[in-house]
Amino acid sequence: MKSAVENLTPTRVKLNVEVPFEELKPSIDEAYKTVASQIQVPGFRKGKVPAKLIDQRVGRGYVLETAINEGLNGWYQEAVQETGIRPLSRPEVEITEVPDPTATDGELKFHAEVDVRPEIELPDYSGIKVEVAAAESSEADVDKALDELRGRFGTLKSVDRPAADGDFLTIDITASIDGAEVDSASGLSYQVGAGTMLEGLDEAVTGLSADEDAIFDTTLVGGDHAGEAAQVKVVVKSVKERELPEADDDFAQLASEFDTLAELREDLAKQAAESKVVEQGVEARDKVLDKLVELVEVPVPASVVEEQLEQHFKAENSHGDGEHDTEEHRAEVKANTERAFQNEIILDAIADKEEVGVSQNELIDYIVTTASQYGMDPNQFAQIIDQSGQVPMMVSEVRRRKALAVVLGQAEVTDSEGNKVDLSDFVRPGGEEEAAEAEAAPAVDSDAVEGEAATEEAAPSDDPAAVKF
């Protein structure tokens, strides 16, 4: 078999393949067996019909067509291996020549157009310089953390006053379009200022007391009338404020392992300082990635991006989030997908250059960490990703994290005050970023984790938009 690559664009090639008759013949022999098992001829058992009789009954041309259909993918895969291309999408195949059905020689010729991973030239990435914010925590950070902790132990208390920011309300709402009621809901709980329901709701309820109402104009975001302008009436049924426990030694004993408030504040101060270091590491990681993308031109195949977009919005629609399929949101998702693809290509190239590997223990650690993010048993999670074919994707993800850790380890990072930043607490000895576990979205299809069937990708490695740094 002969195969040759014709470059169409930096991300698309045409694979020209020629299969000689001697390599086509085994497929023809198998095709005769297939056809023999499909037809019935008096005097012959099923599957035992002679080839000459098959030619008379269905024609040798049909047998040849069957042989080509059954063997085409194998010849394509062989050509991919021979040429070393790395496909990202399913090929568009066109058969240009077939042997004469009446002859015993000739060639099968076809070409396949397919998107491929672009080849890039890596720059010198040692000593990349970035500046990050100073990792300084303050008493205000401790106070904020303490208030958040008190909030977890707070109680709601009814108040006889107008609603204010942060209050908790029970409300009834009714939506009307052109004077006709289209939707309503009663007994909804809502925190003033949350901004999680309807645009304009916070302004409408602020200043209302129990049993008072207001009418405001807004755009509906769910249901049959999503995206339509409507007039909404909101009735406040109750107003409650959160009553926080006193910050004292008793609270420290209730909410923590410490006996005194001073000890609790000391621990919160330590956590705040560690959090600032993690934030600093995340900022350094993101800025190093930004620098790499600036230094390397990575062409992005449009068809791959479009496929990812369709998969994204198909998943959103299946979960009832179709109202978010707007032009603005599509542009945002498209930009994020393109950037994620560029990150993947660059980090894969660095991993190749640095000969980065992934040990079984590193993969297990990553699976355990990701499982905890989903609140799942690691063994159950591992079984799900194995059944959905996502293990190679996770291996690639760990490998990219290690590649990024290599670059981070060589980067020159200073804070806004000119101090050199030590990332040793952020980058693990094994190469995986400490903060990436919490900050980066897991490169696992959440639909598969929830038990839905994962879509099998044509790419030889993994989903090109899966890396979410």
Swiss-Prot record:
GO terms for biological process: 'de novo' cotranslational protein folding; cell division; chaperone-mediated protein folding; protein transport; protein unfolding. It is found in: Cytoplasm. GO terms for cellular component: cytoplasm. GO terms for molecular function: peptidyl-prolyl cis-trans isomerase activity; protein folding chaperone; ribosome binding. Residues 430-469 are annotated as: Disordered. Belongs to the FKBP-type PPIase family. Tig subfamily. Consists of 3 domains; the N-terminus binds the ribosome, the middle domain has PPIase activity, while the C-terminus has intrinsic chaperone activity on its own. This is Trigger factor. The gene is tig.
